[in-house]
Amino acid sequence: MTHDHKLKVEAIKRGTVIDHIPAQVGFKILSLFRLTETDERITVGFNLPSENLGKKDLIKIENVFLTAEQANRLAMYAPQATVNIIDDYQVVNKMALSLPELLEDVVPCPNSNCISHNEPVQSSFRVKKFASDVVLTCKYCEKEFERHAVIR
């Protein structure tokens, strides 16, 4: 007699699944993107096994559907993530993420002297993609930052 001791994250009937999030980043995504500001059920998995990443995080939100624009904002924190739209337990749309050219209200400016810290404005960065990194230029102080300096 064999016993299967694996627990699986329950499938959702309708909603959004954000998969292939780097381990330890899922909670940050939940918080920064205010994904918990819903009455719908949210299922999360942290440090799940992953062939590509070693470990990954996973977020499932029932009856909430991210647009491509919303999904692409996640690419700053989880560039290899995929966003799957689910209907009747089936993936009806699978989105690979791509950083937008303009990133607004996603990350704060690392320059402590930037006016975005003291004025009622949302952060805004122009995004330049290079083969090995991403450089963000703040709309207000015009300073350039590499991705790792911004996402902390």
UniProtKB/Swiss-Prot annotation:
Q: What remark does the entry make about the cofactor?
A: Binds 1 zinc ion per subunit.
* One GO BP: pyrimidine nucleotide biosynthetic process
State any GO CC term. Answer: aspartate carbamoyltransferase complex
Q: Which residues bind Zn(2+)?
A: 109, 114, 138, 141
Q: Which UniProt keywords apply?
A: Metal-binding, Pyrimidine biosynthesis, Zinc
- InterPro entries attached to this UniProt entry: Asp_carbamoyltransf_reg_N (IPR020545), Asp_carbamoylTrfase_reg (IPR002801), Asp_carbamoyltrfase_reg_C (IPR020542), Asp_carbatrfase_reg_C_sf (IPR036792), Asp_carbatrfase_reg_N_sf (IPR036793)
- Top-rank lineage group of the source organism: Bacteria
Q: Name one GO molecular function term.
A: metal ion binding
Q: Which cofactor does it need?
A: Zn(2+)
**Subunit organization:** Contains catalytic and regulatory chains.
Which HAMAP family does the protein's record reference? Asp_carb_tr_reg
> Could you tell me what this protein does?
Involved in allosteric regulation of aspartate carbamoyltransferase.
The Swiss-Prot or TrEMBL record describes its family as follows: Belongs to the PyrI family.
Name assigned to this protein: Aspartate carbamoyltransferase regulatory chain
Where does this protein come from, organism-wise?
A: Proteus mirabilis (strain HI4320)
